[in-house]
Amino acid sequence: MVATVWLCPGQGAQKVGMAKDLAERFPEARATLDAIDRTLGFPLSTLMFDGPEDQLTATENAQPAILAHSTAVFAVVGPRVDGAAVAAAGHSLGEYSAYVAAGALPATDAAALVRRRGELMQKAGTERPGTMAAVLGLATAEVEAACREASSSGAVAVAANLNGPDQTVISGDPDAVRKAGELCKARGAKRVVPLNVSGAFHSSLMAPAANQLRVALERAAFRDPAFPVIANATAEPVRDAGRARRLLADQLTAPVRWVASMQRAAELGGAGARFIEIGPGNVLAGLLRRIVPDASVTSLGTADDVARFLEAA
């Protein structure tokens, strides 16, 4: 029996039209989206299908939209996968989708949590503006050193998303992030790309959001996951509800340790493990191939993707 690891994408993967074809072809996907609409109290699925784009990309909408897409795919393929799930992992907000896949949280509850998460992150970003930038072609250790130097005046610049061996996202106060980017270029970075975000995610600037999110997480009806979920903050498997709550709150101010998470997932899966990315796009599949070059990975985002996968299963 093939060991399966589920992968769930994070913010940035949203686009107008997302999951529309899934809802039209698969009743399980439509039912998942309808249930999330009812829980949130507004037609998120309409925003996903038809836009407008500026509203869909707002943090408080983009986060539940991506989770809705991932969980709609899982509702279709999860029960039909021939293989034992050994782990799940999600990038940033995708960690919530991973807990849904592991049976620790209903999709509707997770959507409400990430909607709240997005609102709190947006608020924190308004109260203390921050920014993020992707550093390409430079080792993480060099990026971290540049951030330490840029932060020496008291402003914040940190390595926030450790996405690949030579792809790191930095986060913090705008001036410090700009300085860190310049220092990264001086150290040999190929490119530094500013990101269009509403705050300094995964940095200490998100502390007010993390504190309030912790309250919402404590009230959420978590169960122990049926299989381990690899936490962004530690890159270690989580097997109980209490630890899941704590680490999801910690996640807002901690780096996303994606390289280490994928290495740990590969260890849990063992030789021949199959990784399945569920949700919009295929970014995580691309990152995985750079981290674990011999990994077998499939991305399921569209109705055609899902249909082909089910035919071959």
Model-derived segments and spans:
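A structural motif
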Residues: A85, A189, G270-G272
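NAD(P)-dependent dehydrogenase/reductase Rossmann-like domain
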Residues: A176-V177, A216, P255, A271, ...
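Alpha/beta catalytic cores of group-transfer enzymes, especially the acyltransferase/condensing modules
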Residues: Q11-A13, L40, A102-P255
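Small/polar (Gly/Ser/Thr/Ala-rich) solvent-exposed segments
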Residues: A265
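Alpha-helix C-cap/termination motif
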Residues: R25, R80, E149, S153, ...
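Short, conserved loop/helix-junction motifs that constitute active-site signature segments
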Residues: F222-R223, L268-G270
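Polyanion-binding loop/helix "lid" in catalytic or ligand-binding cores
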Residues: V259
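FabD-like malonyl-/acyl-CoA
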Residues: M1-V143, L195, R274-L310
